[in-house]
Design a protein with these regions (language model features):
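A residue-level marker of the well-folded mature domains of exported/periplasmic proteins
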Residues: 1-219
Length: 219
């Protein structure tokens, strides 16, 4: 999901760079909301959401993203309760706005979130400050999960994108595997016979299948 989110962010920024660069300094400043300190998925999403976005930016001749708070070596703000919560993300953004805003010339120009719940909290904070509402500047906010709330926020123009599990790919994997097992093949053999680019066999377990994520920016 982190890889998919990062590429989606990079592609969006390349297409909309000047609009996102609020202070016109040529670099996009970002905040990162991490769901949990130790969760491996949170770690990977935090890492690759930025790394893969930077890869796209670099390929397009653009500078890498700059974390908004140079005094924070972690380059993220984490839900200390490990709950991936909207409340934690909103609290962080409310606090960030005190020192980082348009008047000060150092506004956060992009927010990357480990999940859609945290994205909701960020958007609530932005909207209280007059952003991400009809007729106002939209700070791009990206999440993961493609929840119904996130889809509604995207439809309203308040959220830019999220990442969803490929439901069609999941259904195809189940159908093809079930058919192969019904023909007498062992599960590992059945999975190995799949020929869809949406599927990846786990390197450490021949009977484990990964189904690709897909970007979501609206219906």
């Amino acid at each position: 999901a982190g890889h998919m989110q990062g590429k989606m962010i990079g592609d969006f920024l390349v297409a909309n760079y000047d609009d996102v660069d609020l202070n016109g300094d040529g670099t996009i400043s970002y905040a990162m909301m991490k769901g949990d300190e130790a969760n491996i998925e949170a770690i990977y999403r935090t890492q690759y959401g930025v790394e893969d976005a930077n890869a796209v930016l670099t390929a397009a001749g653009k500078p890498a993203l700059a974390y908004f708070d140079a005094a924070n070596p972690d380059c993220y703000q984490v839900d200390l309760g490990g709950a991936w919560s909207a409340a934690a993300a909103k609290d962080y953004m409310d606090t960030n706005f005190v020192s980082y805003n348009e008047d000060a010339g150092n506004m956060i120009e992009l927010v990357i979130c480990n999940n859609d719940g945290m994205a909701e909290g960020v958007i609530a904070s932005l909207q209280e400050k007059g952003y991400n509402v009809a007729g106002a500047h939209v700070v791009p906010v990206f999440g993961v999960d493609a929840t119904d709330n996130a889809k509604a926020l995207i439809a309203d123009g308040a959220m830019t994108g999220t990442v969803k599990q490929d439901a069609d790919g999941m259904a195809a994997a189940i159908s093809q595997t079930a058919a192969a097992v019904a023909e007498g093949k062992a599960p590992a053999e059945a999975l190995g016979g799949l020929s869809d680019a949406r599927f990846t066999i786990a390197g450490d377990c021949a009977s484990k299948l990964f189904v690709a994520y897909a970007p979501y920016t609206g219906e």
